[in-house]
């Protein structure tokens, strides 16, 4: 399903933990890392696609997460010319994405990249909130910057709360 401008509708998923860190996933058999993402099927809403992709790519279900936010608008990126498949019709020149910010509600051990069938990722880790903006492949960087800027107002309070919890625990240990 490609729109008239050549963009494939897609969802992107940012999963954060209670410390305000985000899940960063390594593409299967590659050295590149990114957030989970995937196409929206015909007849599927963006939210339905997000939950399907969440299971397929990370092995989590609706009960394992809580939606904290979604982007107000669709965000687009163009593929580099070397990645465009010119022999397909219609030609897909890039992705238009609706992004979701999710809070992880289950233990980290429930994350399973193999659960959803053919794995798209072979590893993951928690990273600081802004880390992905600097590390993602260059043609996705502007979208990542815009997504993280939009979601920062939701995640920053989580980080402040985590810092307060940590300071409180440290004081209890010393006292």
Swiss-Prot record:
HAMAP family linked: Nudix_RppH
Question: Gene3D superfamilies in the record, alphabetically?
Answer: Nucleoside Triphosphate Pyrophosphohydrolase
The molecule here is called: RNA pyrophosphohydrolase
Cofactors demanded by this protein: a divalent metal cation
Keyword set, alphabetical order: Hydrolase
Domain Nudix hydrolase, chain residue ranges per copy:
6-149
- One short Pfam name that applies is NUDIX
Keyword Calcium, does the record have it? no
Swiss-Prot/TrEMBL GO biological process terms:
mRNA catabolic process
Which ranges belong to the motif Nudix box?
A: 38-59
UniProt lists the gene as rppH
Its family remark reads: Belongs to the Nudix hydrolase family. RppH subfamily.
**Known EC number:** 3.6.1.-
Q: Which domain of life is it from?
A: Bacteria
Q: Which GO terms describe its molecular function?
A: mRNA 5'-diphosphatase activity
Name the enzyme group at the top EC level: hydrolase
- One GO cellular component term: cytoplasm
According to its UniProt entry, the function of this protein is described as: Accelerates the degradation of transcripts by removing pyrophosphate from the 5'-end of triphosphorylated RNA, leading to a more labile monophosphorylated state that can stimulate subsequent ribonuclease cleavage.
Query: What SUPFAM superfamilies does this protein's entry cite?
Result: Nudix
Q: Does the keyword Hydrolase apply?
A: yes
